[in-house]
Amino acid sequence: MDAIKKKMQMLKLDKENALDRAEQAESDKKASEDRSKQLEDDLVALQKKLKGTEDELDKYSEALKDAQEKLELAEKKATDAEGDVASLNRRIQLVEEELDRAQERLATALTKLEEAEKAADESERGMKVIENRAMKDEEKMELQEIQLKEAKHIAEEADRKYEEVARKLVIIEGDLERTEERAELSESKCSELEEELKTVTNNLKSLEAQAEKYSQKEDKYEEEIKVLTDKLKEAETRAEFAERSVAKLEKTIDDLEDELYAQKLKYKAISEELDHALNDMTSI
């Protein structure tokens, strides 16, 4: 009789232990289900973020295309301006040669060239005006440098956002590993949930690989944009320098032509005076 009571007590104890294990397994199952749902929500959120990343990459592609077009236009403008400079240099050479010939004819009237010195003073004042314009152009370049710094700041902000996404992915992976460790302690009823967790893990790793790939593509686009921006800035600088050279050469040509015309008038006046003097001497 005592043996039967003892056996019944053991059976009762086994029953209570079995109930405790069942409750624990049920609790673990519920926790795994909750964690699985949370991971699925995180997966959906991450997919949305990746979609946003793809949109930003498209914008970078458009920006790269625009930068290439601007670079081509600036290089064409610089080439045209350099051609104009060469043409103006040839015109200056011809005008200078003609001026040299005029100065040789006016060698006997050097005493009356004080007015030419005044014209040189006016040319110096004109050069000062050109220098003031150059200073304004330098201020414009400084403004463009400020705008470029702002663009770099925007790019750095984009890098910071991608680093934040990568950090969150690392946190999610850590949470997932801890979830897998707890899931291994569950009873056989949790096996199906474990398979689902493995699937979610694979999806997260795949998404992480995609995020890394997009990050590398973005870095490449940013580097290409930076190179093209530097080339564009160089081409614009060449074009601005060529334009300033053209303006300066045109002003020089105008001054030389004015001086040549004035010298011709002086030569004509001196010739007339000499003719009058010769006529007076002949009359005497």
Swiss-Prot record:
The modification N-acetylmethionine is found at M1. The keyword Transport does not apply. Pfam families: Tropomyosin. It comes from the Eukaryota. Gene3D superfamilies: 1.20.5.170, 1.20.5.340. GO terms for molecular function: actin filament binding; identical protein binding; protein heterodimerization activity; protein homodimerization activity. Residues 12-40 have a biased composition (Basic and acidic residues). Signal peptide: none annotated. Keywords: Acetylation, Actin-binding, Coiled coil, Cytoplasm, Cytoskeleton, Muscle protein. Residues 1-284 form a coiled coil. InterPro entries: Tropomyosin (IPR000533). SUPFAM superfamilies: Tropomyosin. It is found in: Cytoplasm, Cytoskeleton. One of its GO terms (cellular component) is cytoplasm. Binds to actin filaments in muscle and non-muscle cells. Plays a central role, in association with the troponin complex, in the calcium dependent regulation of vertebrate striated muscle contraction. Smooth muscle contraction is regulated by interaction with caldesmon. In non-muscle cells is implicated in stabilizing cytoskeleton actin filaments. The molecule is in a coiled coil structure that is formed by 2 polypeptide chains. The sequence exhibits a prominent seven-residues periodicity. Belongs to the tropomyosin family. Homodimer. Heterodimer of an alpha (TPM1, TPM3 or TPM4) and a beta (TPM2) chain. This is Tropomyosin alpha-1 chain. It comes from Chelon auratus (Golden grey mullet).
